[in-house]
Amino acid sequence: MSAETPFLDTPLLLYLLSADSGKADVAEELLRKGGIISVQVLSEFTSVCSRKLKMSYGEIREILTTINMVLDVRDLKPTIHETALDIAERYGYSFYDSMILAAAINAGCSLVHTEDFHSGQHIQDCLLIVNPF
C-alpha cells in the first residue's frame, strides 16, 4: 500500500450501519476504494456493535469478515505504542486516539479519514487528518 492509501478510523465503519444514509453512503464509498485499519479499529467496532447496538457476535463476525476482505488490517506493535505516547503528549489527543494516528503513520499513510480529530491538522509532518463528511 502506498502513502495515497488512507487509514480509516472506527466511526467510518460504524456509519455502514447508520440510519444516516448520507454518512452511510460516504463510508461505503470510502471502503469501496480500500484503505488501511488497525486491529484497534476492529476491536472498537466490535465493542460498539455488541454493547451499544446489541448485535450478536455472529452478526458482528459476519461484518468483520467482509471488512477484513476489503481493507488491509495491520497489527499493533510496541513502536506504534511509543509513537502514540509522543502524539498524545505533543498534540493533546487521548492515548487511544493517538494509537489510531500512530498506526496510520506506521502503515505509511499520509491521510487518515475520521470525524473525531481536527480536520486539516498535520501530525508529525507526515499525516493529514481529513473529515470526509
Which residue stretches match the model-derived regions?
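Short, conserved active-site loops that position catalytic residues or coordinate cofactors/metal ions
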Residues: 39-47
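Active-site neighborhoods of divalent-metal-dependent phosphate/nucleic-acid chemistry enzymes
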Residues: 72-115
